[in-house]
């Protein structure tokens, strides 16, 4: 699936350039209309100078008034917003043409499935569940107010018109560009989690009413063509969210915030369901005179009418001979009652409202069965099946919320509870990990409460326990689909998982004796050490009878989350990717040994440095046997609009992920290569990873690197941009890489065009393999190993985005002389990495194999470079003012933040 890093058009480039030029001309007219011709002249002058004479450009910008500088940045940024949306529209057009000529990706996947074992294919389809999980950080740098207007511009661009309508269309485009210019793209205040939730809900609402139904309808048809029926109760596509549930490092996410976000989601989810049911009511005019109905339908209708006095006598009279329409009216009333119940906080009343999506689906199934048995099969298995599958995909909650908390928070709360009991000879905090694991496993089997309610714990402990109580309350009020997974970040051992399980038991979420586990406990492995210990952690869990029982109660499925960001930040991209690949193999082997199905949750970022890149390729590059029909993948805030703003691209992205998961699960069940080849490649990757890791650690362990990083990038401005509700640094961390979260780490390098996390160390790794005389193995890996080819492709694309010519300007202007040796190290590794990657690909220049993407980057640079020059000039001014102890200039800060937004738009990502 395309991400912010790769979603570039491959359509006819001349048509694309013509449309970009058309919008660029309209933007020029907007600038003249709004600000006068002088601004347009200055924009063109700056663009020319940055290409021809960098020093003259820098000199000009150093003396530019702040207000003019801000307008300049806004002009270039607006150009990028318009160029981006034009590329998306053309990509959508191209996909439509390809679909018409060759069929969609699901059709091509269905053709491949004819080679699959029929029984295994049926099992895969039964278990099929692809879940994109929306996260908030780093939040889309463009505000929703801007995105709404860009969406309108996209719709106008995609409207086929004849010459007589062209003038009117251009007027509408110009109006919207004027509105974009007059809209403040900077957030005035940092968004609350509820604001972030509204941003995700905006996209989920659109998906609900469009792309998802198309994908599910196509999937059903293509599977039937491949000889497999998609079972009625299978949910092949669902959605998840972390917004409102991710409290790791975000003090703003309290139990109350979680509750408020769930209420907000349900308001939208129920409204979307009402819209679909209203549409159904319009269709279901089947008369009892011409089409019969089952006894089940008539009995359920009678029961509904008795319990729902709100149904108007008029409806009962008008629809007396239309039982299907009257049943749809009852379903609608139950949805309205559910909405009112949630708003008022009153208890669920069976038969009057819905407790979860399953009850809604059950009502619709009664209608579907009756239609099938009374000559209405075409509609039952067509439009109605589409409605049912779409409602099952989103549920009344729109997206299932994951809850995430740091492992230490659970131990902090449990320590107080165990120490209060005084049963152990040492304090909980002093216990070795192995001892603590046994203690917690024993406690999980026990039925006693650890503490009275409310528990005698401090404020942080109370907050942690409150989260579990909120989860329990949510399941009671909203139904079982609202929260399914509790994720433990920085999970280093089995005791971290047991700790969360014991607290869940305390809250009544798990009872092994009564035979229920209402949530699953999910370890998040996010550092290189944790990834290396993946099999040991899972083995320690599944070997324990109490935990194995918990997994059995969750359908014999164990979810494990793999974190790409932190492993890359601390180990470098090569070691991160390789250790994640190996961890998946080891997790697969342990899970299979215990008869457990593994659900991997990939915590991938939007950028290559945080695990990003095309999702479709990444899924197909997974080790054999690791996919068994289920996968979860994070959709980071900053790539959501790239993937889902344009309906055609939303459909394509979902189709790509579903198709890849289906293909990998059904066909990649055994090694594609011989054991000898795999052993040879593994040994080669060990050489590459070790050398790359050494080079990367040499860079990050340079004592001057933290200061160089802050000097050569605008990372200190990240907090002021109000991108998201989560702080960019860990509390009390100061100037250190350990204290900086992975997102601002990537953000800073990206803004200064160095993009170190996306490629650093790769050249040293590949060189080490060549020097070991393994050139032929390298070629073999690139030609035959999907994992390695995907890795090299992502690195090559990041190298093409990296621009050390621009980075040199940052360093020359902003970095003290005594720190410039760090940039020399970066330049040397960059030169080596480009050379080594070209050796592997056989190209003479980066992206020779993708000339359209290469050309796109070249065109973008002409508009991106001026923003970078402006950013350097403004950073210099701000730092000089700070050194002189002058009061911060709000206009300067604003202009600087506009450059940050502009570079993000130009490179199509924040972090």
Swiss-Prot record:
EC category name: lyase
Residue ranges crossing the lipid bilayer per the database entry: none
Any one GO biological process: carbon fixation
InterPro entries found in the cross-reference section: PEP_COase, PEP_COase_bac/pln-type, PEP_COase_Lys_AS, PEPCASE_His_AS, Pyrv/PenolPyrv_kinase-like_dom
Disulphide bonds in the chain: none
GO cellular component, one term: cytosol
PANTHER family: PHOSPHOENOLPYRUVATE CARBOXYLASE (PTHR30523:SF6)
Protein name: Phosphoenolpyruvate carboxylase
Native species: Streptomyces coelicolor (strain ATCC BAA-471 / A3(2) / M145)
Recorded name of the encoding gene: ppc
